[in-house]
């Protein structure tokens, strides 16, 4: 597969005009610009779509500093010249419909910067990601899962969590238990872990499990705290549907599910969010605010409406689409204090 970044040069030109594909409307663009489009994950990213009678996938990405954007994947031999994307109206969102694509296709966005360099980036809104060390996004369809946790959800809606007793078992699925098998490094799948973990948690008297590092991340040693795929349950343990099975199973056994959530910082990996379109986009441009000295990571630019929208929509995504019962926010202090991890004169 193509590497995550390239130094290929390309002559740039003005953005082409397009009428759009009818997915992202004027209201969507307005709410996104205001930072209030809390279901934006239904619009950006990759989604099954039917256009003019043809089934395929719709792709959309926000890249305001890009000179051009195209889609690459196995379907076009990772050729950045093969499948160009077009901006929606006069916005900074690029879109494309590709007929014939289905679930399980590897893809990235090839973003041409204004210096002519082409960056191969994973989709920030992808629902699924390639198993590491691969770094591509993977087309998925998260619509079809049949939940049967209605009893739990109804009880949750009528309960004040602040007043209810709670006892939490914090667990990292990748190291809690492993199997003696070569496939996927012996990891339990979400489905396999569900039954054993639920039985243990019930036996020990816990009310909730708190899962560490579920969003996609490239480096095992980070335990999931350096995220590159905020909308993708890590493929180490299975698919998005299988993670829904995990949550559903826990709820049926009377166990709540809390996720560790990492909106404080993100890694510098070339395929990820850092310098996404050739410039600081998701991170602060000023390195005094945009770089975390302790962890060597980037700090989200919370002042940008589109970035805060990305994070708020992500929090709601896990709650609405995966029925999780709460989020434990990681590294809050580093988000609150400009001098966090910095010496006098460094901020």
Per-segment meaning from a language model:
Residues 150-163, 172-347:
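Substrate-binding/active-site clefts of carbohydrate-active enzymes
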Residues 69-71, 107:
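Short beta-strand elements bearing conserved aromatic residues within extracellular beta-rich modules
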Residues 1-54, 86-170, 175-183, 192:
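The feature marks proteins involved in alpha-glucan
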Residues 62-69:
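Short proline/glycine-enriched turn/loop motifs at strand-loop junctions of beta-rich domains
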Residues 55-59:
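Structural beta-strand segments of beta-rich domains
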């Amino acid at each position: 597969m193509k590497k995550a970044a390239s130094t290929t040069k390309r002559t740039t030109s003005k953005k082409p005009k397009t009428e759009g594909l009818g997915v992202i409307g004027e209201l969507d663009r307005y709410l996104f610009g205001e930072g209030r489009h809390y279901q934006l994950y239904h619009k950006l990213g990759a989604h099954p779509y039917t256009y003019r009678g043809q089934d395929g996938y719709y792709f959309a990405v926000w890249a305001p500093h890009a000179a051009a954007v195209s889609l690459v994947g196995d379907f076009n031999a990772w050729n950045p010249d093969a499948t160009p994307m077009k901006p929606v109206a006069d916005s900074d969102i690029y879109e494309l419909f590709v007929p014939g694509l289905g679930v399980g296709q590897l893809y990235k966005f090839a973003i041409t910067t204004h210096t002519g360099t082409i960056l191969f980036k994973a989709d920030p809104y992808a629902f699924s990601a390639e198993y590491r060390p691969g770094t591509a996004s993977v087309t998925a369809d998260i619509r079809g899962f049949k939940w049967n946790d209605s009893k739990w959800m109804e009880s949750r809606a009528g309960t004040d969590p602040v007043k209810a007793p709670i006892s939490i078992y914090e667990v990292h699925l990748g190291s809690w238990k492993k199997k003696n098998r070569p496939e996927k490094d012996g990891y339990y799948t979400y489905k396999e872990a569900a039954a054993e973990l639920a039985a243990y948690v019930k036996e020990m008297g816990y009310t909730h499990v708190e899962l560490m590092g579920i969003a996609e991340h490239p480096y095992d040693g980070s335990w999931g705290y350096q995220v590159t795929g905020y909308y993708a349950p890590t493929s180490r343990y299975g698919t998005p549907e299988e993670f829904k099975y995990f949550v559903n199973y826990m709820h049926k056994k009377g166990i709540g599910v809390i996720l560790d959530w990492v909106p404080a910082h993100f890694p510098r990996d070339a395929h990820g969010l850092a310098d996404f379109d050739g410039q600081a986009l998701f991170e602060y441009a000023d390195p005094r605010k945009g770089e975390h000295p302790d962890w060597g990571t980037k700090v989200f630019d919370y002042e940008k409406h589109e970035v805060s929208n990305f994070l708020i929509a992500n929090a709601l995504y896990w709650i609405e689409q995966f029925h999780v019962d709460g989020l434990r926010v990681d590294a809050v202090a580093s988000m609150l204090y400009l001098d966090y991890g910095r010496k006098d004169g460094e901020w």
